Swiss-Prot record:
A lipid is attached at residue 315 (S-palmitoyl cysteine). It comes from Hylobates lar (Lar gibbon). GO terms for biological process: adenylate cyclase-activating G protein-coupled receptor signaling pathway. The keyword Transmembrane applies. Interacts with MGRN1, but does not undergo MGRN1-mediated ubiquitination; this interaction competes with GNAS-binding and thus inhibits agonist-induced cAMP production. Interacts with OPN3; the interaction results in a decrease in MC1R-mediated cAMP signaling and ultimately a decrease in melanin production in melanocytes. Receptor for MSH (alpha, beta and gamma) and ACTH. The activity of this receptor is mediated by G proteins which activate adenylate cyclase. Mediates melanogenesis, the production of eumelanin (black/brown) and phaeomelanin (red/yellow), via regulation of cAMP signaling in melanocytes. CDD domains: 7tmA_MC1R (cd15351). It is a multi-pass membrane protein. The gene is MC1R. Belongs to the G-protein coupled receptor 1 family. Keywords: Cell membrane, G-protein coupled receptor, Glycoprotein, Lipoprotein, Membrane, Palmitate, Receptor, Transducer, Transmembrane, Transmembrane helix. Glycans are attached at residue 29. This is Melanocyte-stimulating hormone receptor.
Length: 317
């Protein structure tokens, strides 16, 4: 089997010409001379993937080691790290296999290569979907902890968290299997795009509401201690910057990939869209970058997790 038949790179079937979406592919002379294609070296792609793997393995191992971190919040963080780990691992594995095939160091047998490609695509796609779900779950967990603080432990119990986690994983695997099987149907692509937009809106609404509550709380404290208003304004500005960074990273890392899916449906033959299609590997690299950033935002900022990680690393040395 030719190497090109395996080079899909995570849903890479979208990077080729789907049969049910007519004439997605364009001839090279139709894309125009000004088409910008950002080439991602395999070495850089592998390096980012390995960094993400190490980070997320540390998060999962640290949470598993410390029983004090077996709360619903840390369960969601652990599952997010596991999802990001699978995203990175799937891409790294696929890239390594592609490089081995290109170097003729691995025999390309259709009976083995194609099923392996399908398995990698399902694992990577399901981990991407679950990663988005767990980002939403973490946002909802924080929201409940702020607005229902007194009832939090009765609302977000460990059994309920485990049920939610199991439901997310099962739904992610089922949806991803259908997506890989019917990737050439526009409705399937649109469902995935709508899912991303729903997660984006959910996170934006929850975090904006949490920021507003935090500002009100800071204002109340300032009035209680007869502080000056600039203190409250400074707190609000800091919170707004944090919120912008949080949602901005999410949108910048995930948005281009889902823009790619949207354009496949809306303008498969337009030269400008075809130029965007050429940067598919760049969009995957941004997702890997998100898998690197997630532990920094959601895991390593927590003091208990950092302390456990430090103790583990110290003992290992």
């Amino acid at each position: 089997m030719a190497v090109q038949g395996f080079q899909r790179r995570l849903l890479g079937s979208l990077n080729s010409t789907p049969t049910a979406i007519p004439q997605l592919g364009l001839a090279a002379n139709q894309t125009g001379a000004r088409c910008l294609e950002v080439s991602i070296p395999d070495g850089l792609f592998l390096s980012l993937g390995l960094v993400s793997l190490v980070e997320n393995v540390l998060v999962v191992a640290t949470i598993a080691k410390n029983r004090n971190l077996h709360s619903p919040t840390y369960c969601f963080i652990c599952c997010l790290a596991l999802s990001d780990l699978l995203v990175s691992g799937g891409n790294v594995l696929e890239t390594v296999v592609i490089l081995l095939l290109e170097a003729s160091a691995l025999a390309a047998r259709a009976a083995v290569v194609q099923p392996l490609d399908n398995v990698i695509d399902v694992i990577t796609c399901s981990s991407m979907v679950s990663s988005l779900c767990f980002l939403g779950a973490i946002a909802m967990d924080r929201y409940v902890s702020i607005f229902y603080a007194l009832r939090y432990h009765s609302i977000v119990t460990l059994p309920r968290a485990r049920q939610a986690i199991a439901a997310i994983w099962v739904a992610s695997v089922l949806f991803s299997t259908l997506f890989i099987a019917y990737y050439d149907h526009a409705a399937v692509l649109l469902c995935l795009v709508v899912f991303f937009l729903a997660m984006l809106v959910l996170m934006a609404v929850l975090y904006v509401h949490m920021l507003a509550r935090a500002c009100q709380h800071a204002q109340g404290i300032a009035r209680l201690h007869k502080r000056q208003r600039p203190l409250h304004q400074g707190f609000g500005l800091k919170g707004a910057v944090t919120l912008t960074i949080l949602l901005g990273i999410f949108f910048l890392c995930w948005g281009p990939f889902f823009l790619h899916l949207t354009l496949i449906v809306l303008c498969p033959q337009h030269p400008t869209c075809s130029c965007i299609f050429k940067n598919f590997n760049l969009f995957l690299t941004l997702i890997i970058c998100n898998a690197i950033i997630d532990p920094l935002i959601y895991a390593f900022r927590r003091q208990e997790l950092r302390r456990t990680l430090k103790e583990g690393l110290t003992c290992s040395w």
